[in-house]
Amino acid sequence: MNLKCLFCGILVGLYVEAIEAVNYTPEKISASISLKVPGNESEKYSLDMRQLKNDRSSYLLEPSKGIPMVITQRMEDMNGKLRINVSLTALEDVYFNFSEQLSTGFNHDDCQFYMPGFWYRRNLRSPKEAPSFHTSDSWLVREDRLSAPLTGIYSEKEKSFVTVSRIDNFANEVLSTHREGEIILSGKTSIGFTGFENQNGVATLSFGFPYREAPKSYIRKLTLAPSVEAYQLLRKGESLSLTWELHESEIADFSECVQHIWEYSYDTNCPQIVNTPYSPEKMKEVMSNFFVESFVGNTPTHYYSGVELRTATCDQTDVAEVGFVGRTLLNAFNALEYGEQQRRTDLVTNAYKIFDSYLQNGFSETGFFNEVVHYRRNFVESVHSIRRQSEGVYALL
């Protein structure tokens, strides 16, 4: 898809002359707004785009029937990117959720998808309990799940990609009393949603405000939960402005697409160093106490206790795990390195005890690491994994 073929008819006025911006066709865009009265099911209204007579870059988003809101949308060319500004004004107190979809024109099956820090290709390397194509080929997520509030769709057939990115200062957030279904927010949030959907075989960018998650929400690691849709109050006479930026380009492959998206995200969001009250040296000193408090030295293989740890008590457990969650050998290497740097003989001594105990007692009869040992329950897990074995070898070498 080429946005220059997608968006037709908009002229951006600069000085006396008008310069043609990214072309726009309402047929490729669909928008809707859902309104909710607390205690009742929401009502969804489709929005038709009607171009304003005196401004060819602005549209009135007309609902399918009368609602107590006025919604307008303005498009502006920003150095070859299309910036969309949506303005919502309440004629009376309303709880709302606004959404918009952009059809890329790409065949959904030809596409790979990217959401920074959360979604790569089709996420098929993730467990089925995490968001992936194992569950659905369409996903909407909260923007704060991502390293940047952006979704990208890359067509391997067309060698082209399209992204949508939210532009905001993200100053507000509010807790909700429920985690699923239609929920009423108790205050203002800056968090919207972004994602992709398969609409009749066509890959579609979806975005809106406030947040939605569908077809599942992801409440914690490896835990999918029912979908959620948030509604924020807009009081009579109040207005809210929402801004997204569309960007498209031709590119050779998906890896180059990811690189381009990261560079674009950094340039757009300009992340700054966060000033903290504690120095890195102080935090390392505090965190190194884990190597002291968690050390277990009365078992055939010594280890740092962390697996199945109860955070309320931080009591030591009986599970010695080489890699992954337990990270016993890598933690021993970290403790050894830090201990030598800081001349902490206690850390160095315990680290060597762990290495020596594993070299003596940590291998199975077939020569692999005993990856997970449950000492009080008196059994060793027999299934081996590349990750734990490789982490153990890496730490020892």
Explain the meaning of each model-derived region.
Residues 1-6:
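Bacterial N-terminal signal peptides that target proteins for export
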Residues 8-17:
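Hydrophobic h-region of N-terminal signal peptides that target proteins for export
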Residues 23-27, 36-40, 46-236:
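Beta-strand/loop-rich accessory regions of lumenal/periplasmic or secreted enzymes
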Residues 25-30, 37-40, 234, 238, ...:
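Low-complexity, Ser/Thr/Pro/Gly-enriched N-terminal "stalk/linker" regions
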Residues 222, 226-230, 310-328, 375-391:
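Solvent-exposed loop and edge beta-strand segments that line ligand/cofactor-binding
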Residues 246-250:
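Short, charged beta-turn/beta-strand-edge "cap" motif at the junction between a beta-strand
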Residues 329-345, 391-397:
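Well-ordered alpha-helical scaffold segments within catalytic/enzyme domains
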Residues 348, 356-397:
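Extended amphipathic alpha-helical coiled-coil/heptad-repeat regions
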